[in-house]
UniProtKB/Swiss-Prot annotation:
InterPro entries: YcgL-like_sf, YcgL_dom. Residues 3-87 form the YcgL domain. It comes from Cellvibrio japonicus (strain Ueda107). Pfam families: YcgL (PF05166). This is YcgL domain-containing protein CJA_2437.
Length: 98
């Protein structure tokens, strides 16, 4: 099975991406998700096949989600989230004088 997918990046969250089938666009993505995601910024178009490797997502789960729900949400890698949380904690402790 081959799927041409459009991948959008979130302007609100670094490392968060939304995959949709190119022929369907964003039509099946719930409004609530789009609100949380922010205005989608097109990042790339990819041909997805079961043999393809993705850097931060399981291709099988991506294809299954695209077929079932019409979209796949890729969350930021855990280390990126942890690094950002640590940076915010450090900044907050400096601001509060601790």
């Amino acid at each position: 099975m081959k799927i041409i997918a459009e991948i959008y990046r979130s302007p609100k969250e670094e490392g968060m991406y939304l995959y949709v089938k190119k022929e369907e666009g964003l039509g099946r993505v719930p409004e609530e998700l789009l609100t949380l995601f922010g205005k989608p910024q097109q990042a790339m178009v990819l041909l997805l096949t079961p043999e393809k490797k993705l850097a931060n997502a399981d291709i099988g789960k991506v294809i299954e989600s695209l077929n079932d729900k019409g979209y796949y949400l890729q969350l930021p890698p855990r280390d990126l989230v942890d690094a950002e949380a640590k940076r915010i904690r450090t900044l907050n402790s400096k601001l509060s004088g601790h």
